[in-house]
């Protein structure tokens, strides 16, 4: 059904598309009317363009509907995108509620480059564990200064508003993924009006954004809207991506906000539609064991096969094994200390005791580990969980206690379980069942400041190359300082050239600097590019280091 609607909508918009006014590039004609963008010196921006009807009222907890309104006046595309309503981990303090429910927009950034008449397109999905984040959290000026690519940032529903699910056709879930899908369709249909090349669209994202890219690519019809994808620091194999106990959690959500009387999914959905959005999103607090743990209490699900417009109805592993996914080039990445994103908060000194939270793991490891590492819902008995928790602690820490001194091994555990192992699994599946090129790289070059220092609120600990250290060289982020070292400037330029070359390449090749990444499909060994301060090197591995 989604594929049929795709063909119909593509046909409509291709017939309707028009171009930028050559007399004034700030004005663009779209099927809904004329828009006015902003001149930012070295690039143009066209922000907050709606691609879907507001997901409010009866459209809450429903698949997104294409935007229908016709503008009689020129649409003001100079306002930055609003934040989708969320309980945001990056807000310190008790009240983390921010954003609005009516938020489904795309924002377009086009470089001023008179040497190019058209531009390849990067569709960007922000990260945030499917719970928080926004289109504005990652900058675009690095990419605009290079002057080679149009960037489109996508806003999508998050947390319970985007991913509540009862596991049946009545409240199927994955609304945030369906938002992304409709946004990609909008880009395909309309980007030529901005000077973009609809035949040269690549989708990129980081963390949950990277996992989103991968999930989009697991649909065979992805190839109709984009030609390649890059998943930085997250993919569909990560244990925090696919949720197995969404039904119970969604009914618990209903109980928290006053829908405890609901006896079935439809009654629950109707009740939730009547509640203020802020109450629903604020209920996230009740699912956290401590701090912001687990960091993803709501997220993607495997939908019921009879759900209308199901996004996926098989587990990603089974989809890949079936071969029924988009056979287009894909790249997947991880950082050597990705897990610092999850572990660093344990190094913050607590106001009440003056000591770090990591010491509390000595008394609460068996209680907290299943939530920290996302196996609470995948094991059937408490004994299974305790046995696995004990095994992990022994493997990574031996007989040592949790402390600041043992932090490095704790983050190593988090890196392996939450990121690295999933990257290895994804590559293993693709090299056996894929047909189009699949590439991988590992980044090992610590930033001076980053997410580790941000959450730990300290700089006296070596955090390594933490989650986002590579991505923020492409898309700026306030979690790291604004300045780049000379080696990072070179790496940033190489990343931007890599993305550009990947999307315009006719044969799906991928190059970083002077290194050509090697395809994993059909390979007996893992082909992994190592990127460090000193350059790049192709590795052939039996297993990940």
Curated annotation (Swiss-Prot):
It catalyses: a carboxylic ester + H2O = an alcohol + a carboxylate + H(+). Disulfide bonds join 84-103, 259-271, 515-536. It holds the Pfam family COesterase. Changing residue 537 to V: In strain: JR50E and JR341E. Residues 1-19 form the signal peptide. GO terms for molecular function: carboxylesterase activity. Gene3D superfamilies: alpha/beta hydrolase. Keywords: Disulfide bond, Glycoprotein, Hydrolase, Secreted, Serine esterase, Signal. PROSITE patterns: CARBOXYLESTERASE_B_1, CARBOXYLESTERASE_B_2. Its main location: secreted. Glycans are attached at residues 113, 421, 507. The active site is at residues 207, 467. It is found in: Secreted. Its EC number is 3.1.1.1. Belongs to the type-B carboxylesterase/lipase family. This is Esterase-5C.
